[in-house]
Amino acid sequence: MKVVYSDTHRDHDPQQFMVRGKLKRSNEQPERAFRLLAAVEQDGHEVVAAPDYGPGPRAAIHTPEYLRFLETAHARWQLLDDPSDEVMPNIHPFPGQPCSYPESLVGQAGFHMGDNACSIGAHTWAAATASAHLATHAAQLVLDGERAVYALCRPPGHHAYVDRANGFCYLNNVAIAAQHLRRVHPRVAILDIDVHHGNGTQGIFYRRADVLTISLHGDPRHFTPFFTGHAHERGDGEGLGYNLNKPLALGTDLDGYLPALRDACASIRAYAPGALVVALGLDAHERDPYKGMQITTPGFATLMAEIARLGLPTVLVQEGGYLSDDLGPNLASALRGFASSA
């Protein structure tokens, strides 16, 4: 399988991440991508670079105000009186209340950053745009005839909304890939198997019928992102019925996961898309630091084989999966499983 990768991410190394009121080192570190890259190289996958697709693919998903903010925020932040090294918000709009766009950079940070897990450093914009190019190129390779392509994206993207960074994510790579596939295919499906709900992806396509979004994730009553990912969220307007959430109990193992995945695959078959984008989170693993589920390393092969049996042109986009000795083996298992049924 072709693997699209760039080392531009290496200088994006967020230092701050708030956990239960304490600032800690972010779990979204460059070492994640290095371990994933080592795994695909060890298994003999062909690693290719992505060209610069320009601003078009990201602009097709994200607002101009948000993109300007992401590109300029860090340099502008450093001009403030006594700034931190990274941009972090300390105030947010209140949902359901009137909200005007602020001129103040501090206000813009609160407007465009949904939490304290998406700090912006000097190299964040370059890493995020490079990551989006990887997803776009993977989609283009699939349009050019590849059965499946893996985009080794870092930073991840599925928590990013049209105008808001969130949960380690800045540009929504799976949404960008899906929109690129829409240039050819009237219908595209997104299947998110990250342990966390793909809230940004849901928000982007919530009122659209041309992209089916399905997410399997830890029950948001007890697990981040908490406020979205419930089964009753089914889309709105033209998109009603085209957003499916399958929240799973924390600690779910392969036996509990497979029925939900098979239901998701049945929904994809019924939708009959021309192509599929998989938000490939590996953080449902039993020893992932987030400890949300109990999928084993061989279990990822089983899950991905089930997805491959859909028989669709498929873009695999890296999402979560955090530092442990199992991270690389989990990816290797997932890709082998997909190849076994492709």
Protein language model annotation of sequence segments:
Residues 1-191, 196-342:
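HDAC/HDAC-like amidohydrolase catalytic core signature
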